[in-house]
Amino acid sequence: MSKIIAVTMGDPAGIGPEIIIKSLAEGELSGASAVVVGCVQTMRRILALNVVPTVELKIIDKPADAVFAPGVINIIDEPLEDPQALKPGIVQAQAGDLAYRCIKKATALAMAGEVHAIATAPLNKEALHSAGHLYPGHTELLAKLTNSRDYAMVLYTDKLKVIHVSTHIALRKFLDTLNRDRVETVIEMADVFLKRVGFTHPRIAVAGVNPHAGENGLFGDEEIKIVSPSVEAMKAKGIDVYGPCPPDTVYLQAYEGQYDMVVAMYHDQGHIPLKLLGFYDGVNITAGLPFIRTSADHGTAFDIAWTGKAKPESMAISIQLAMQLA
């Protein structure tokens, strides 16, 4: 039996519904074993824009009822409170609430074994918060729903892979909370993740915090007090890890094949190089959950929502990768 992937709609006022339809209606994923969790009426409104050739929406109650065939998209309906009031490209509380409910439903299905992985379309954090769900993003929400203590965001392309020590936290607060335990945990998670996806002997680089990785304490002492001891501790456990590496060169070295993954210290340190080099094919993966979760590596793109202009490549790759890793 094929592994079933739950695909969550994300914010319905963004490009999520469109990139899901484009991903599942055409190409390699047409007829794939994926079940959408989202608002049926919103999907119908997107289909009315003729973004793809004719496709059938099959409403199901549970994944076991799905019929996987070309031209068919299976969907478990999570209705909006007022679907006709939904407007594209605008922050709306009901859209944030729907995105939350879709994640909650998909997580319950995964924890029950009814689906084997989750691929998520982007949500809008402001809309999520306006609905009363005060999470920084998907990663933290999924960790809460699954009671996962140790987790990390991975950005994944064929040529560059990055895992983050911190993500949705103010840079000033990151510097105040950085500690050896977290750095060592993320290095270990990187090693486990890479082995899970097929690397037999992963090579992991750990980026420094400061310019030139601190230049032996000239530009900060986080490398001396935290990063270097963490790297040495993980080497003692048998992990092939290097660092602290200067952040301005380590990503190029990884891109050219010297390392299999970079441990980034904070959000933009990891996101900028990966989005520069792999914006359209990058995938976001949450390491440390009890199931595989992947996501398109971009936002809701409100400026082009419901226009037919959204590119589905990152969403399609995230679904394919979820199937591969499940």
Swiss-Prot record:
PANTHER family linked: 4-HYDROXYTHREONINE-4-PHOSPHATE DEHYDROGENASE, D-THREONATE 4-PHOSPHATE DEHYDROGENASE
Organism: Pectobacterium atrosepticum (strain SCRI 1043 / ATCC BAA-672) (Erwinia carotovora subsp. atroseptica)
Entry keyword Oxidoreductase: yes
Swiss-Prot/TrEMBL cofactor(s): a divalent metal cation
SUPFAM superfamilies per the UniProt record, alphabetical: Isocitrate/Isopropylmalate dehydrogenase-like
Keyword hit for Signal: no
Keywords assigned: Carbohydrate metabolism, Metal-binding, NAD, Oxidoreductase
MF-aspect GO terms: metal ion binding; NAD binding; oxidoreductase activity
Cofactor binding note of this UniProt entry: Binds 1 divalent metal cation per subunit.
Annotated family: Belongs to the PdxA family. PdxA2 subfamily.
InterPro entries per record: PdxA_fam
Chain positions recorded as a divalent metal cation binding sites: H168, H212, H267
Subunit note: Homodimer.
Classification of source organism: Bacteria, Pseudomonadati, Pseudomonadota, Gammaproteobacteria, Enterobacterales
Biological role stated in the UniProt entry: Catalyzes the NAD-dependent oxidation and subsequent decarboxylation of D-threonate 4-phosphate to produce dihydroxyacetone phosphate (DHAP). Can also use 4-hydroxy-L-threonine 4-phosphate as substrate.
One Pfam family from the record: PdxA
Binding, substrate: H138, T139, K275, N284, R293
EC nos: 1.1.1.408
Catalytic activity: 4-O-phospho-D-threonate + NAD(+) = dihydroxyacetone phosphate + CO2 + NADH
Superkingdom per UniProt: Bacteria
Name of the featured protein: D-threonate 4-phosphate dehydrogenase
Gene3D superfamilies: Isopropylmalate Dehydrogenase (3.40.718.10)
